[in-house]
Amino acid sequence: MSLFDWFANRRKSSQDPQQRPEREIADGLWIKCEACGTLTYTKDLQANQMVCPECTHHIRVSSEQRIQQLIDFNTWVPIDPELRATDPLKFSDRKPYSDRLLEYQRKTGLPDAVQTGIGNIETEPVALGVMDFGFMGGSMGSVVGEKLTRLIEKATQESLPVIIICASGGARMQEGLLSLMQMAKISGALEQHREAKQLYIPILTHPTTGGVTASFAMLGDIIIAEPKATIGFAGRRVIEQTVREKLPENFQTSEYLLKHGFIDAIVPRTQLKKTLVKLIRLHKPHSLTLISDESLETGPHCHLPFQAESHNLSTTDNKIQPTPQG
């Protein structure tokens, strides 16, 4: 073959798509936003707390990522990290419950659907529980209930604020009444925590539904939600079939709940850590620090009922009180 023929064949193969070798792109290098379809470099997305830079869609993250986003480096101490569920009911649907547990444990690297522990947020110690939707839809079984209850009890003993990040489809059907009773158990622990005058902040993420919504998700002193999160008890179709009415488009969203007074604030993930620190410091015992307008600024996408444009706070007679406008 002459040199001319070699170059001719080379040019022909480069123009033929079937002859052109495929470029290999490393897995996980780019992430596509499920809301707007934008491809974003994974490291850039992680630096933005897994919030799409184009449409601000909050991409679902694991419990491990949540802990890394909130807790100061090298301060996380897990509680009961190896607590695992058994199968006392010998439940089986398409597969035995015990097999399903093993499947999700291998898939996520977690023993169950929640991580709990003690750590610092900007040097402030907190008791943190983080539900993981990747483990059986974040469903609440006996292990989830037990770990959260122990976390709250430890926080009560050590006078720590409790923060629980909720992401759940509700009670775990494979555990029947053992799952449902966790609602009352966690709620009872939270009542003791409240009587000890300690702070509890639930953070509702997409989705927070079922028995979790009907119990500890809605028992906070201050209830925070991420933007556009689905929050509710029964599903939309079930409600529409029951009431025989068409529901609003934004029904069961965090924005709808804020408008109707069911939650206290919508805070973007990128501003969550800063907001939590301010709330924790504001609720410290004997804290009478003057809260300035600047310290309450949270950003254009953060909806707080106590933002500076709504109230100026001042101290009078050893109490923090709203100052009349004008």
From Swiss-Prot:
Indicate yes or no for the key word Lipoprotein.
Answer: no
Listed GO CC annotations: acetyl-CoA carboxylase complex
**Enzyme's top EC category:** transferase
**Bias category Polar residues: which stretches?**
309-326
Domain CoA carboxyltransferase N-terminal, first and last residues per copy: 29-298
List the C4-type zinc finger ranges.
33-55
Q: Enumerate the residues binding Zn(2+).
A: 33, 36, 52, 55
Q: Look up the signal peptide feature and give its range.
A: none
Cite the residue spans of the region called Disordered. Answer: 302-326
The protein's required cofactor(s) are namely: Zn(2+)
Q: How the cofactor binds, per note?
A: Binds 1 zinc ion per subunit.
Tell me the InterPro entries matching this sequence. Answer: AcCoA_carboxyl_beta, Acetyl_CoA_COase_Trfase_b_su, ClpP/crotonase-like_dom_sf, COA_CT_N, Znf-ACC
Query: What GO MF terms are annotated?
Result: acetyl-CoA carboxylase activity; ATP binding; carboxyl- or carbamoyltransferase activity; zinc ion binding
Q: Its quaternary structure?
A: Acetyl-CoA carboxylase is a heterohexamer composed of biotin carboxyl carrier protein (AccB), biotin carboxylase (AccC) and two subunits each of ACCase subunit alpha (AccA) and ACCase subunit beta (AccD).
What protein am I looking at? Answer: Acetyl-coenzyme A carboxylase carboxyl transferase subunit beta
Its organism's taxonomic lineage begins at: Bacteria, Bacillati, Cyanobacteriota, Cyanophyceae, Oscillatoriophycideae
